[in-house]
Amino acid sequence: LTAGLGGDGFVLASLGCRVRLLERNPIVHSLLRDGLDRAAVAGEDDSELADIVSRMSLIEGESRDFLGRLPASEQEDIVFLDPMFPERKKSAKVKKEMQAFHLIVGSDPDAGQLLELAMQRARYRVVVKRSVSADYLAGMAPSYSLEGKSTRFDVFALQRLPG
């Protein structure tokens, strides 16, 4: 749901998921729009890429507003949140592109409220992408977490998946 830089959405779309990317920052939204437009043009010569891009839609706006207006009949199966990672406690700086992204986007002080709303609006799962060293978002312990080297995915299981 929250677009970030679009990479996770692209991966999910490449796995066959329909993905709605929401981005509230107009600069980041424009960058994502440009990237999707370029991918669509490249997809004219690459049917696999065209299929992936066709499963992605980009919406400019607040995720909270979008979820708040979503009718119950159109509930999202899974809501994926990618709020800005909190400040690092280590002295090592983040990569330059992420430093620039932090400057453009700023922090996500409303991420906890978005999580609460997502828990009400998702059908099966809410997934929150976090730094492995970060506290749980809004202090809410997930059903389980999947942890990598630097990133953790906190999964809130709301009900059994079909099938």
What are these regions (language model features)?
Residues L1-A3:
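Conserved beta-strand/loop positions that form the S-adenosyl-L-methionine
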Residues L5, P26, D65, M84-P86, ...:
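Short, glycine/acidic-enriched loop or turn micro-motifs at the edges of active sites
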Residues L5-C17:
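Conserved SAM-binding loop of SAM-dependent methyltransferases across substrates and taxa
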Residues L15-C17, K95-Q99, Y144:
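Glycine-rich, phosphate-binding/catalytic loops in enzymes
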Residues C17-R18, R125:
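Residues at the starts of beta-strands that form the adenosine-phosphate
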Residues R18, L22-I78:
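S-adenosyl-L-methionine
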Residues P83-L114:
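Mobile active-site "lid"/loop adjacent to the S-adenosyl-L-methionine
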Residues D110-A157:
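Conserved Class I SAM-dependent methyltransferase catalytic core
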